[in-house]
């Protein structure tokens, strides 16, 4: 499981996650996620919210819902075409009022990247700092 996309995204045993805009072949794309629980709604608190973006301009409209689902200590992963990566950072900064920051990115499949956003350290719960 260590080299699957699931492992790289931190999705594994005991992880509760949800997806937005996942492709039809999502299970194959993700790989072995162990005993992770996939919710089909964005009811918080989620450990991981995985958002597939065809267009980074959707960030402004969806950010509040996605980040609320991951609050207080989860992560929002945005999956987009690698050429869109530079557009993700300022869009999230603006949509979150600077309260969320990127701290990791990975190459996935088909020329895509996934960028992880977490709350700024000083706004996280003490046990997650």
Task: Please identify what each model-predicted range represents.
Residues 49-59:
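Short, glycine-rich nucleotide/cofactor-binding loops
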Residues 97-129:
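Class I S-adenosyl-L-methionine
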Residues 15, 20-23, 43-44, 52, ...:
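Catalytic cores of nucleic-acid ligases and guanylyltransferases
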Residues 26-33, 86-96:
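Short, aromatic/basic amphipathic alpha-helical patches
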Residues 1-31:
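N-terminal, charge-rich interaction modules
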Residues 36-46:
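Short acidic low-complexity segments
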Residues 60-92:
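Mid-chain, well-packed structural core segment of small domains
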């Amino acid at each position: 499981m260590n080299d699957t996309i699931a492992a790289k995204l931190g999705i594994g045993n005991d992880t509760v996650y949800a997806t937005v805009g996942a492709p039809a072949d999502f299970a194959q794309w993700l790989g072995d996620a162990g005993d992770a629980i996939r919710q089909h709604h964005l009811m918080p608190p989620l450990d991981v919210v995985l958002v597939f973006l065809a267009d980074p301009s959707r960030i402004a409209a969806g950010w509040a819902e996605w980040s609320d689902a991951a609050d207080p200590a989860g992560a929002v992963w945005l999956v987009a075409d690698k050429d869109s990566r530079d557009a993700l950072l300022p869009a999230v900064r603006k949509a979150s009022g600077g309260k969320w920051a990127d701290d990791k990115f990975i190459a996935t499949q088909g020329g895509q990247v996934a960028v992880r956003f977490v709350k700024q350290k000083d706004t996280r719960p003490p046990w997650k700092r």
